[in-house]
Regions:
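Short acidic/glycine-rich loops and adjacent helix/strand connectors
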Residues: 1-202
């Protein structure tokens, strides 16, 4: 009723709530990549923080049809892993991820082995995060003291701490891991569904 009343406020002629359609978050992402493309068939890989529960999905698009085939669910999320490092390097979560990505070329990926203690990456690119290092599922911060101890520093406070080579190397390392996962996922789903075209969304 609340939604119906809000719609009536915007459109006095609105009569019924029967036509309201809530589209799945990841299906919407996949549609935004596949349907505007020139492709008649493609496998669509979507990765983000979290939709309803899905964090990574594989869909197959053919002509005007799109079907999600498999999902990875919260709290295992490549997007939230990236956001955890956004937080750790002193940038704002859900807006500063581009800064972390922009910082990556200035560093060296020397912390990849340590990051792999946080995430179990399978050969097909699927993954699971070790929740012992994170707070985002249960707390008010992205990471915790175990995460800090792994890398030897607390999260950077942007109010009084400058970006150092350490933060550049951290950024480079998480970028490297993110790319490794996306490449493995892309190769495995291309092989599994025997479709050469790939759309990315998220």
């Amino acid at each position: 009723n609340l939604l119906f009343n809000k719609l009536k406020e915007h459109d006095k002629n609105y009569k019924s709530d029967k036509n309201i359609y809530f589209s799945d978050h990841h299906l919407s992402h996949a549609a935004s990549a596949f349907f505007p493309s020139p492709l008649e068939e493609a496998v669509v890989l979507t990765a983000d923080g979290v939709g309803e529960w899905a964090t990574t999905t594989v869909a197959v698009g053919k002509n005007n049809k799109l079907e999600i085939k498999k999902e990875i669910h919260f709290p295992h999320s490549l997007g939230l892993l990236y956001s955890a490092f956004t937080y750790y390097t002193g940038f704002k979560v859900n807006s500063g991820e581009y800064k972390l990505m922009g910082l990556a070329p200035y560093g060296s990926p020397i912390y990849c082995d340590k990051i792999k203690k946080l995430i179990d990456i399978k050969e097909d690119g699927t993954f699971r995060l070790d929740q012992n290092y994170f707070n985002y599922a249960t707390g008010l911060t992205m990471t915790n003291s175990k995460f800090d101890n792994l890398f030897g520093q607390k999260p950077r406070d942007p109010r009084n701490e400058k970006i150092t080579q350490f933060h550049m190397d951290i950024a480079s390392s998480i970028q490297c891991i993110t790319e490794e996962i996306m490449i493995k996922l892309s190769r495995s789903i291309s092989k599994e569904y025997k479709i050469k075209n790939l759309c990315l969304a998220g």
